[in-house]
């Protein structure tokens, strides 16, 4: 055998032996990313509201879809932000209503249920008994049917109107809430009224009166 080939063969053999005996290379450690805690979004639960000027000591809670738009001594109104829904807490002890015929301002009726049923500007259902915040009251659903916009209820800082539009109203009259007559008024478009009733029930359930 050629000496050069023999030497190359021997060198290759020795190289293979050295390679087989050498320790295997240790792979570089893989970096593990730090664990990130998932972001927790706080739920938007009902928030209590209590007026500083309202004559009754009342607390009412509502969610992010509602907000207070009236804050008077005799009226707090909670309204839907996205929909034309209103829940008004009217202290009517000294309020006046509009006579449906003459339009004159007259004292709030002693027998409101009979008055609203005889009012030609409304088509009213039969009254039912309800309880709000532990106080018994009378509930009447009614549909305004005026031919033009008219005044209805006068409060100290504002008033309620009836309009010739497809609306439905719910009256809840509590005759004695710590010495005051309180008329809770829910107004919503006719096609949204049932939904408004359901979603506003939690507002009514949250009401608390204190002395």
Task: List each model region and its residues.
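N-terminal targeting sequences that direct proteins away from the cytosol to non-cytosolic compartments
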Residues: 3-94, 128, 135, 163-166, ...
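Functionally engaged cysteine thiol sites
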Residues: 21, 96-100, 148-151
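Structured domain cores in non-transmembrane regions
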Residues: 93-109, 120-122
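Short amphipathic alpha-helical segments
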Residues: 104-112, 195-199
């Amino acid at each position: 055998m050629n000496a050069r080939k023999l030497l190359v063969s021997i060198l290759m053999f020795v190289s293979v032996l050295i390679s087989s005996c050498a320790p295997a290379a240790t792979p570089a450690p893989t970096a593990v990313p730090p664990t990130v805690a998932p972001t927790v979004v706080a739920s938007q639960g009902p928030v209590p509201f209590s007026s500083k000027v309202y004559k009754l000591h009342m607390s009412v809670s509502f969610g992010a879809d509602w907000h207070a738009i009236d804050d008077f001594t005799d009226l707090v109104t909670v309204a839907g932000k996205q929909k034309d829904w209103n829940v008004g807490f009217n202290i009517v002890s000294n309020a006046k209503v509009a006579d449906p015929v003459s339009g004159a301002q007259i004292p709030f009726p002693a027998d409101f249920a009979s008055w609203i049923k005889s009012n030609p500007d409304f088509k009213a259902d039969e009254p039912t008994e309800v309880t709000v915040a532990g106080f018994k009251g009378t509930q009447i659903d009614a549909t305004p049917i005026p031919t033009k916009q008219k005044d209805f209820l006068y409060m100290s800082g504002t008033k309620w109107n009836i309009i010739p539009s497809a609306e439905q109203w719910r009256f809840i009259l509590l005759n004695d809430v710590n010495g005051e007559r309180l008329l809770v008024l829910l107004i919503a478009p006719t096609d949204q009224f049932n939904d408004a009733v359901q979603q506003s029930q939690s507002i009514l359930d949250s009401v608390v009166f204190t002395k």
